[in-house]
Amino acid sequence: MVAGGLHGRTKRPQVGVFDGFMFLIGYLYSRIVHRADFVVEEGVFEDLDGPMIVVCNHTCGIDPFLVSAVMPRRVCWLMAEDMRVGWLVWFWNWAGVIFVARNRHGKSGIRRARTHLKDGGMIGIFPEGHIERPYGKLLPFAPGVGVLVKRTGARVLPVVIDGTPDVATAWDSIYTSSNARVRVMRPIDYSDSGLGSAEIANDLEQRFLDWTGWELGSRKTREVQHDELTDDVVQSISDDSRQIA
C-alpha cells in the first residue's frame, strides 16, 4: 500500500498516501481491464490551475473512473442524488461526489458545485445526461453545462472518450474489457467570449462532434441507456441554477 501510495503521489503530489494508493488502483484498473490509452495534448497538465469544469462525452458507466485515472487533480463528479446508497457512501464521500437531486431540490447540490469551483476546485460533468446509444452518436448537450460555465467563470477542460464497452447497462461496463481511449484537450476559457449560456453549450457540442467525427442524435428519436450515476443531473442544473442568485 505504501508503494502504491508513493506512486500515486508522484502523479498527484497534493494528496496523501491513501489517496495515492486509490489513484494507483484506478489507474491499473483502467490500463489492465480497459487497456486505456491516455492521450494528453501538449502542455495541458501544466495549465490546470484554478476552477475547472471537466466536460466529457458519456459512453458508458466507467467513464468517470477512466477520466479520474489520468487527472493530476481530484475531479469531484456531479451525481444523481438517488445514487447515495448506503454501501457506497464511504466511496462517494472519499471521492468528493457532489449529489444533485433530479427535481427542484437540486439547487443545494448546484450551490455546492459552485462553491467548490469558487474555491478553485475541479468538477466533472457529462452534458449529454445519458449514455450515448447507439454507440458512436453524440447526444445533444443540455444547456445546463453552459449555465454552469457562464455563472462560475470556470474554464472548461474537454475530455473525449471512445473505445469503451458497448454493453447493456452502465454497471456491465465495470467488468467488461475494452480498448478505451481518453483524450484530454486544451482548456477553454469562455469568460471573455461574449457567448451566452446556450451558445456555450452549443459550442462545446460542436467541438465534440468535430473531435469524435460522430453524428448528432436526438433523445426524442433514439434509445438512450439509463445511467443512475449521471441521469438527469445536467437537466436539473438547467432547471434549478437559474433560481440561485
Where in this protein do the model-derived segments appear?
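Catalytic core of membrane glycerolipid acyltransferases/transacylases, capturing the structured
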Residues: 48-104
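Glycine-rich, highly charged phosphate/nucleotide-binding loops
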Residues: 36-39, 105-109
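Solvent-exposed polar/charged
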Residues: 30-31, 69, 115, 150
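Helix-to-loop junction immediately C-terminal to a conserved catalytic motif
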Residues: 26-58
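Short hydrophobic helices that act as membrane-entry/anchoring signals
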Residues: 11-34, 89, 93-96, 100
